């Protein structure tokens, strides 16, 4: 039975039994930054099980895409070496939200397996929790399962959503693959040991309790059911194979890989046990097939390889696959072709694979090209380090080496670990982590000098003590730039003090402030803190937890702990920063609309001068796309939408559709910032009151910062206006230089002046003219050299084989390498067989070209001759046996160099 038939049969069976067919959710969880990837069928129903969301149905059935490759559920390192571990798998499941419970859930599962799939009952075993007599009785009395085929376990048969929340016993169904699949014949022991013969194919969770506090179980008024079965495992059972990789879900990809690499896939366990080389090939093919699935589906759902969060996990999966591909063949590419096979076989079930086909394949090829260069170079360097360690009898690779591989060569630490372990060498994990931590500290300290220095460590303790004492700090900056506060703590940068005087620099903590502390990508405010005639200039503002640190220079008077003060943020700096920050939110929304929903924020920096926004995208943003993005943002600015902020629970914010960043920690109550129906994000920064205050938005640069991450820099308000005014001035100058008359009607003039009607066309036309003139000039330069005379004066020498050949030594007063190369070719054609050495005349460095006829390049190499000539003249160069080029500064030694060539040829 095909896997597609099993999937369809499952859906239809439960639909027939009153279940709502719910499509698979994306692998990228929507509005749940706590979850790395969708890893179970119940993920999309989480709020329903928690009682936070009501649906218009109480029964559901799904075939859910799942990835387990990071966090709590991480199967990555097992993939390829066991029969049933995968990074990507499909979980088919049925769910009851306060509807049916144990009796129906058990009946549905047993009926589907034994009647719809016609699995022999003697091939199945079930497990229940040690306390769940009810489930055991249902299995025996209702479904007729013999008591001896029902086993009881403890923790393995009790499921929890977390430390607190819904939980309950579960019952699992195991399939017996027979004695050939494993060595343990006793089913209880085999199941307990997780042996390959007895494989779990379905788990039924009975959510009948609520745990809170931990250890205290309260019965739920409406128990629910959450079930999940692995399609891969069901397929193996129905297709009569022991290993999931031998099913039709993997074999099309594996067979294609065998064809690409001209290799053989062997699945027989006994054969593999006796043939380590074949076992290595089989494991590599299984890794490739599995990782191709997770890679393709993750990219289709919006993930991109990067160095953080979900993107980093995807990159690890892809690079692990690429490395195993290199083990199979040094010059063959496997992943793109295998991805095409996957799209062909599963695209009808998951149409996103087909609609995003080009994006998937381009992303895979790009990451493969990048990593192979890193892999080849890094592997060679790592092998040298491992050889050194072995020669000294060292069994551990130092953390410094692992960090250097990562930091200098871009070689992933986990890959270093794998390669080292394969050769029996461990990695000093603690030392590596220390190197990483030291590097992070250095990076923080170097960022514009704004980070906390070591001499401020005492303030961290003070800030935390202040918070723990129950005192609060009020931020007044959302209401305005001026406010009242009291000095609560002072530091001179070395220790706490009671007073700062004129000329002192240090840190100041207030109980209330209008100054925004650097955070969330927004720079800290600047301005003044005053009392009476005393004035402190705030040069930067940072934050520890919720305590704002004002970095101050006392310009006049003194400040003491307990002094009442007035805070005044620089209004121009605040206004410009707010415009840039609000524009960043509009930019984020516009990017997702123009480029796709795979775009997510990967970093940002907002200050009064510009906004810098990093985002996930695997190719440059085209000029047409940039224009669309700018138009969308400026359209929202022109609409004069009010910028609304609202405090609400984190859950309510996500339900409202607010964008949340994966990996970001949020408080229970969050600030939601909305601009019309265009943008809705969680944000604690300062913003404009109305989009019209942004005035104008202009992108000034777009570039890549790492694989899969692009960066846009943009300006707003006065900066954008000045930029545009300058651009118009330059345009006017360019128009005049191109022959257009300056006038208010020049645009109309451009439209009616013939084939060079636009400035761009005129510039392109001029560029073509310049290229043609350069070509003609080079032709004239080449014509200045009398090739016939040089060929006629060629010297004759004998090759090692005794044949006659010609030698031309030419001193040519030209510096264009292309022209010199053409002269060299003409000379070689004239003499037919021999050697041509041409030295040009440049400004400080003189080009040298050596060309040798192919029939004698085996005994006399162009590169060797070039090194001698260039060496005499104080230069260097290199090339192929038949052609080489270089340069040298000392033309005075030209005759000596030519004499050297003659002597080498016996002249």
Curated annotation (Swiss-Prot):
Residues engaged in binding Zn(2+): 581, 585, 683, 687
InterPro entries, A to Z: aa-tRNA-synth_II/BPL/LPL, Ala-tRNA-lgiase_IIc, Ala-tRNA-ligase_IIc_anticod-bd, Ala-tRNA-synth_IIc_core, Ala-tRNA-synth_IIc_N, Ala-tRNA_ligase, Ala_tRNA_ligase_euk/bac, DHHA1_dom
Cellular compartment(s): Cytoplasm
Keyword Aminoacyl-tRNA synthetase assigned: yes
Segments traversing the membrane: none
GO cellular component, one term: cytosol
Broad class of the protein's primary localization: cytoplasm
Cofactor binding mode and count: Binds 1 zinc ion per subunit.
Cofactor(s) the record lists: Zn(2+)
Biological processes annotated in GO: alanyl-tRNA aminoacylation; negative regulation of DNA-templated transcription
Catalytic class of the enzyme: ligase
Catalysed reaction equations from the record: tRNA(Ala) + L-alanine + ATP = L-alanyl-tRNA(Ala) + AMP + diphosphate
UniProt entry keywords in alphabetical sequence: Aminoacyl-tRNA synthetase, ATP-binding, Cytoplasm, Ligase, Metal-binding, Nucleotide-binding, Protein biosynthesis, RNA-binding, tRNA-binding, Zinc
Top-level division of the source organism's lineage: Bacteria
Domain characteristics, as noted in the entry: Consists of three domains; the N-terminal catalytic domain, the editing domain and the C-terminal C-Ala domain. The editing domain removes incorrectly charged amino acids, while the C-Ala domain, along with tRNA(Ala), serves as a bridge to cooperatively bring together the editing and aminoacylation centers thus stimulating deacylation of misacylated tRNAs.
Function: Catalyzes the attachment of alanine to tRNA(Ala) in a two-step reaction: alanine is first activated by ATP to form Ala-AMP and then transferred to the acceptor end of tRNA(Ala). Also edits incorrectly charged Ser-tRNA(Ala) and Gly-tRNA(Ala) via its editing domain.
The family this protein is said to belong to: Belongs to the class-II aminoacyl-tRNA synthetase family.
NCBIfam families listed in its UniProt record: alaS (TIGR00344)
Protein name: Alanine--tRNA ligase
């Amino acid at each position: 039975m095909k896997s597609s038939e099993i999937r369809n049969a499952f859906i239809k069976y439960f639909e027939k039994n009153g279940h709502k067919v719910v499509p698979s959710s994306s692998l990228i969880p929507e509005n749940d930054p706590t979850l790395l990837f969708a890893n179970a069928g119940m993920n999309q129903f989480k709020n329903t099980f928690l009682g936070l969301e009501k649906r218009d149905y109480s029964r559901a059935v799904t075939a859910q895409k799942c990835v387990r490759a990071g966090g709590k559920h991480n199967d990555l390192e097992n993939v390829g070496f066991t029969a049933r571990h995968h990074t990507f798998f499909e979980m088919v499941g049925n769910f009851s939200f306060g509807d049916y419970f144990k009796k129906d859930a058990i009946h549905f599962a047993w009926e589907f397996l034994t009647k719809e799939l016609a699995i022999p009952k003697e091939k199945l075993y079930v497990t229940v929790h040690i306390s769940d007599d009810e489930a055991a009785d249902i299995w025996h009395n209702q479904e007729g399962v013999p008591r001896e085929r029902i086993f009881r376990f403890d923790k393995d048969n009790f499921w929890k959503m977390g430390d607190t929340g819904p939980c309950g016993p579960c019952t699992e169904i195991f399939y017996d693959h027979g004695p050939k699949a494993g060595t343990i014949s006793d089913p209880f022991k085999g199941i307990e040991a997780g042996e390959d013969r007895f494989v779990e194919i379905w788990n039924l969770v009975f959510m009948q309790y609520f745990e809170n506090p931990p250890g205290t179980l309260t019965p739920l008024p409406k128990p629910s059911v959450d079930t999940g079965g692995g399609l891969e495992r069901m397929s193996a059972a129905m297709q009569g194979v022991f290993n999931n990789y031998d099913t039709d879900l993997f074999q099309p990809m594996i067979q294609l890989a065998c064809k690409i690499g001209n290799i053989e896939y062997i699945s027989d366990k006994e054969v593999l046990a006796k043939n380590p080389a074949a076992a290595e090939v089989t494991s590599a093919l299984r890794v490739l097939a599995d990782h191709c699935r997770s890679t393709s589906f993750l990219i289709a759902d919006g993930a991109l390889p990067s160095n953080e969060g979900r993107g980093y996990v995807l990159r690890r999966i892809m690079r692990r696959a690429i490395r195993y591909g290199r083990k199979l063949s040094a010059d063959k590419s496997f992943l793109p072709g295998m991805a095409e096979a996957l799209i062909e076989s599963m695209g009808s079930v998951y149409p996103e694979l087909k609609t995003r086909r080009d994006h998937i394949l381009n992303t895979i090829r790009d990451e493969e090209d990048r990593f192979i260069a890193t892999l080849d170079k890094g592997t060679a360097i790592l092998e040298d380090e491992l050889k050194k360690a072995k020669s000294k009898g060292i069994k551990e690779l130092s953390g410094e080496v692992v960090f250097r591989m990562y930091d200098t060569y871009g070689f992933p630490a986990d890959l270093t670990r794998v390669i080292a372990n394969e050769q029996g060498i461990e990695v000093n994990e603690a030392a590596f982590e220390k190197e990483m931590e030291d590097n992070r500290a250095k990076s923080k300290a170097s960022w514009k000098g704004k980070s906390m220095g070591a001499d401020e460590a005492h303030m961290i303790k003070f800030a935390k003590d202040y918070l723990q004492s129950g005192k609060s700090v009020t931020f007044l900056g959302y209401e305005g730039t001026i406010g009242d506060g009291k000095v609560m703590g002072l530091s001179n940068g070395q220790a706490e003090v009671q007073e700062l005087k004129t000329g002192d620099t240090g840190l100041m903590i207030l109980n209330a402030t209008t100054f925004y502390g650097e955070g969330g990508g927004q720079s800290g405010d600047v301005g003044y803190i005053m009392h009476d005639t005393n004035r402190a200039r705030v040069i930067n503002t940072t934050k520890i937890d919720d305590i704002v640190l004002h970095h101050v220079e006392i310009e006049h008077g003194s400040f003491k702990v307990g002094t009442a003060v007035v805070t005044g943020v620089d209004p121009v700096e605040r206004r410009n920063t707010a415009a840039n920050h609000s524009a960043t939110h509009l930019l984020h929304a516009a990017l997702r609309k123009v480029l796709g929903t795979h775009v997510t924020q990967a970093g940002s920096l907002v200050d009064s001068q510009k906004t810098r926004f990093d985002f996930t995208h695997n190719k440059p943003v085209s000029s047409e796309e940039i224009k669309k993005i700018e138009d969308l943002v400026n359209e929202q600015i022109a609409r004069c939408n009010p910028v609304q902020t609202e405090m609400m629970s984190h859950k309510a914010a996500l339900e409202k559709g607010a964008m949340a960043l994966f990996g970001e920690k949020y408080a229970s109550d969050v600030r939601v910032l909305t601009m019309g129906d265009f943008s809705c994000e969680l944000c604690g920064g300062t913003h404009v009151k109305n989009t019209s205050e942004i005035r104008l938005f202009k992108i000034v640069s777009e570039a890549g910062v790492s694989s899969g991450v692009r960066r846009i820099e943009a300006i707003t308000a006065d900066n954008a206006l000045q930029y545009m005014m300058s651009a118009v001035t330059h345009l006017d100058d360019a128009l005049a230089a191109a022959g257009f008359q300056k006038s208010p009607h020049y645009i109309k003039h451009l439209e009616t002046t013939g084939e060079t009607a636009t400035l761009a066309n005129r510039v392109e036309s001029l560029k073509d003219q310049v290229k043609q003139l350069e070509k003609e000039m080079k032709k004239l330069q080449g014509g200045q050299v009398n090739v016939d005379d040089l060929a006629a004066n060629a010297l004759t020498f004998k090759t090692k084989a005794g044949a006659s050949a010609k030698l031309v030594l030419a001193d040519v007063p030209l510096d264009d390498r292309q022209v010199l190369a053409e002269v060299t070719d003409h000379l070689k054609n004239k003499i037919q067989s021999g050697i041509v050495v041409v030295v040009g005349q440049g400004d400080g460095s003189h080009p040298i070209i050596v060309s040798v006829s192919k029939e004698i390049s085996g005994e006399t190499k162009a590169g060797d001759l070039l090194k001698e000539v260039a060496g005499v003249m104080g230069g260097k160069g290199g090339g192929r046996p038949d052609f080489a080029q270089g340069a040298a500064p000392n033309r005075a030694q030209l005759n000596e160099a030519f004499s050297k060539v003659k002597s080498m040829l016996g002249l």
